[in-house]
Amino acid sequence: MKTGRMQKPGRVAMKNARDFLIVTNNPLLAQCMEDCYELSFFPDCSYREILVKVRDLVYVGHTLYTHPLSGSVKPNETPYKSIAVSKVPHAFSAEQAGIIAECILAADKFPPRTRALSEAVKRDFQLIDYTLLAGALEFDAAAGLSKIKNHE
């Protein structure tokens, strides 16, 4: 349906898993979804660096399928971020570029995290990021988690 207006990120009708790409730094998400979706996994990137990578994709015409600041966890609280974008670039959208640029500016307003996170807290933040994206994609989060539990 072409109306000349962008649908809100997260509201874009996704045809199937082959239509989009997940950009993430979340190792839990990468493990759970690697067999179902195409991933660009950047384990050493920060939350902000993931936003910048997505911005670069949007600038060449990729479409945001999930909102870059989804969820209620502040950017300075969690190190993990996962965003779904179109797998194939289309025409550049100034509206999409504006959304991701504003998200980067919003993330920059928060002071950087200075305290180290325990492994348990990191796992919790990984799970939060994973379940947010799984919900947006209507992915069976429990099945993904059981897949990795069965391989341990």
Model-derived regions, located:
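Glycine-rich, flexible N-terminal cofactor/catalytic loop recognition
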Residues: 14-15, 32
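Short, polar loop motifs at secondary-structure junctions
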Residues: 23-30
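Glycine-rich beta-alpha junction loops
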Residues: 26, 69-73, 89
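Rossmann-like NAD(P)(H) cofactor-binding subdomain of soluble oxidoreductases
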Residues: 33-78
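Short basic, glycine-rich beta-strand/loop surfaces that mediate nucleic-acid
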Residues: 76-90
